[in-house]
């Protein structure tokens, strides 16, 4: 199944966090925090203004982004966990 985001929404795949501490202790999945960065998979057409114009999203597929810990809505597609997030919830693009 493929997802096509609507309006100013962006689909992001979370990037894996390091599962070991600097001293070599392995962190189990149940104790690890969800990462707050990811890769943009798909981008909606943009936000519609009151006068009907569409403001395009300032991101593209492949961009690495930072977002808030509680941003967006998690969905599972074909066993893969993705995040549907509004453009204004994305804090920065990693360059």
UniProtKB/Swiss-Prot annotation:
It comes from the Bacteria. It is found in: Cytoplasm. It holds the Pfam family Cpn10. One of its GO terms (molecular function) is unfolded protein binding. One of its GO terms (biological process) is chaperone cofactor-dependent protein refolding. Disulfide bonds: none annotated. Keywords: Chaperone, Cytoplasm. InterPro entries: Chaperonin_GroES (IPR020818), Chaperonin_GroES_sf (IPR037124), Chaprnonin_Cpn10_CS (IPR018369), GroES-like_sf (IPR011032). Heptamer of 7 subunits arranged in a ring. Interacts with the chaperonin GroEL. Together with the chaperonin GroEL, plays an essential role in assisting protein folding. The GroEL-GroES system forms a nano-cage that allows encapsulation of the non-native substrate proteins and provides a physical environment optimized to promote and accelerate protein folding. GroES binds to the apical surface of the GroEL ring, thereby capping the opening of the GroEL channel. PANTHER family: 10 KDA HEAT SHOCK PROTEIN, CO-CHAPERONIN GROES. Belongs to the GroES chaperonin family. This is Co-chaperonin GroES. It comes from Bordetella pertussis (strain Tohama I / ATCC BAA-589 / NCTC 13251).
